[in-house]
Amino acid sequence: MAQDDWWLCAPEPGMLLWARLRLREDTGAEVLESSGLTIRFDDLDTGRHYLLGADYRAFDGLDPEDAAALGFELGDLAPPAAPDGPALVRRMTQRLR
């Protein structure tokens, strides 16, 4: 079974981009970006380093101060969910109110 971790970045005020880091059953990893691009890596650590280098932060590692710095309340946001890939990608770019 695959394991998903969600990451986000704020490229400009009022906008969030999500990325999904998935650990595959074969111990490889893949990142699904908000553009719909999927990038495969040999392992989870390489995928994490890729996201960190692109200024993403792990959603499960955010605290209220981190969230405020990105422009949202931690309790008001959850990773995107959708029944299929194209619908998920459409939800991976969010405008904040």
What are these regions (language model features)?
Residues 3, 11-12, 16, 67, ...:
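N-terminal functional modules and adjacent low-complexity/disordered segments of proteins
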Residues 10-12, 78-79:
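Intrinsic-disorder/low-complexity coil detector
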Residues 44-97:
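Mixed-charge, Lys/Arg-enriched low-complexity segments
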